[in-house]
Amino acid sequence: MIINRGKLLLLLLSTAMAANAEENLKESPFSASLELSTKYMWRGIEYGTAPTVFPMIGYNTHGFNAFAMGGYAIDGSHQEVDLGVSYTASEFTVGVSDYYYPSSVGEKDQYFKLNNRETGHWVEAYATWTGTKVPLWVTVSTYIFGADKNVDGKQMYSSYAEVGYPHSFTEDNNIALCVGANLNKGFYTNNQSGFNVVNINAKYSTALKFGNFKLPVSASYVLNPYNNKSYFTMSLYFGL
């Protein structure tokens, strides 16, 4: 389940690639990247303890963005394939993402089993406002289709909201602070509780310099007050 991760990755890589460019070329709408992370954290939820690889390809033109992204733990404990489309106009972005978790065996996660009662897909709609004069972002998202079900098989429409503040000290030294909460009983609290803060995140991003080459890196402290857990992760980013 990867939305903001992809946006951060593209931002870090675009900065690094610009610094490494030796001549001005027409920018391609296609991109490819790879993130290596010490563990997979998303919206305050730990998806495993093993280092995880996130490959991504994307297409971006005139405000339209499409991507395919994967998440693979090196110990084989987690696999994920995400597809998404979004459109940005001025300060607003709306999009839909499909999250899919393949396993080596099993029938419920067959990719083309798309019946809402049986599918293994999780489909989410979201909207984001990113301020230009006010340095904030606000995201609201809801699972609208798929495996986000309660024990009775009913759609939970698990919803999440996040407010964040980015700050740049220099071109290669940035911090982002955010607070996120689930808005109803659902996925983020195992259908046990309504509104709760589930994600407090502080992420510092910089670049390691090797001559003319810059390697984007980040470090994150994550606190989930609802689960009473905290985590620390680091990531490296590569443009292909």
Residue ranges and their predicted role:
Residues M1-P29:
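Cleavable N-terminal export/targeting peptides
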Residues E22-A73:
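Short glycine/proline- and aromatic-enriched beta-strand/turn motifs that initiate or cap beta-hairpins
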Residues E22-P29, G95, T130-P135, H167-I175, ...:
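Short loop/turn motifs that connect adjacent beta-strands in outer-membrane beta-barrel proteins
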Residues A202, T206-L208, N228-L240:
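Outer-membrane beta-barrel "beta-signal"
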Residues G44-G48, H78-D82, V105-K113, D148-Q155, ...:
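Outer-membrane beta-barrel translocator domains and adjoining extracellular loop/strand segments
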Residues L34-Y40, G63-I74, V94-P102, D109-Y111, ...:
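Transmembrane beta-strand segments that form the barrel wall of outer-membrane beta-barrel proteins
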Residues S28, T49-V53, N60, S77-V81, ...:
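Residues that define the transmembrane beta-barrel architecture of outer-membrane proteins
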Residues K113-G186:
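Detector for outer-membrane/organellar transmembrane beta-barrel domains
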